[in-house]
Amino acid sequence: EFYPIHTKGKRKRNFTGLTQVKNDGIRILVIALFYEQFKIIKYGRKSIMDKTVHKLLNQQINKEFYSAYLYLEFSNYFKSKGLDGFANWYMIQAQEERDHAMLFYTYLQNQNQTVTLESIDKPDPSISCHMDVLKAGLTHEEYVTGLINNIYSAAYDVKDFRTMQFLDWFVKEQGEEETKANDLISKMELFGTDPKSLYMLNQELAARVYTAPSLVL
């Protein structure tokens, strides 16, 4: 209950309304602050991330999963041709791309950013011979390199050093991926037309084993 506030010997002035508004405002502010603190405790403090950088990182999850699908398609092609070594090489490529997708996924979650999973397109490469697969693989890696560079550039523009540090690993990784794809093309050009040499190359690729990514989040 509120009472009029006045000073002895002076004309009475009623501050009841102003006093109540002030008290109500304080209550609202306290409740708002409490709610914000509750959200921080429950969900964690949300880091500030540029909208463009966030969008590109989220899209890259989809791109990496598509890469895994594409390499599974390549593995399936070589399996159907009886070249299990080539099939193994591309199966491991698919596993690596899946790992890359999860690294982007985990990074966004660790920054308390929203992750939106998009539908994955069906791979539809034009393949008429073994070399088509290898060249398509190189072209795709060059495409992914461009995507990584684009995200890095966007992060640099807004001085998002944390994201730049995260992407450093992928910049190096893409250089290695392009080198591997080029090397495989060179070997196929040298040995692909000779059945005995192709058999030996297939055996070499069959020896490849999966290695988990060195980047740990």
Which sequence ranges carry the predicted segments?
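Iron-associated oxidoreductase/ferritin-like identity signal
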Residues: 2-10, 14, 18-217
